Amino acid sequence: MTDSGGGVTLSGGEPLLHPSYTLELLAELGRRGFHRAVDTTLFAAPEVVRSVAAACELFLVDLKAMDSAVHQQYTGVPNEQILQNLRMIASFSPSAPEGHPYRIRIPLIAEVNASEANIAATASFLCSLDRKPDQVDLLPYHDIGKGKHERLGTVYNPAGLSLSAPSKDDQARCLRQLADAGLTVTIGG
């Protein structure tokens, strides 16, 4: 894999919910020469985040909403632990074992987190970190997983929440807001 630049990304559910397995898998992948990325919400104990950070080369961090009450409403958990862990990984020196690049991934949902206020709060928070993210990826909402849930006989949106992608104009506004704050931003990752 070192010739191709390829690697392995551990993702959801949430790999940090299973720290022993995640660390064991990351160690084995490292022994085999794979680049290791972890796609996470960072909703975990700080010691778990620190251990995983030392065992991978890249964090892809989902950041859903800056207002903790909104975050709780749409995800079931508040965001304080997530923001604390994000501050921690941003504080790691690039020369430290834990100090790898990290990217922020924002699933943009029109009615939830694509407002000017939330994006401004996100930009302010990210710019306040010791080390800014290497990139911010805006990921417009989609319902691709809906068919999978139907095939499995599970409910796609159990809370019946109104979910839709922001308009192209709103996506462009979100990108501009973050870029104007000095962040490197893409739409679609």
Identify the residue ranges that each predicted region occupies:
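Short glycine/proline- and charge-enriched loop/turn segments
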Residues: R151-G160
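Short amphipathic alpha-helical interaction segments
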Residues: A114, N118, S162-P166, D170
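Short aromatic/hydrophobic-glycine micro-motifs
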Residues: F34, T154, L183-T184
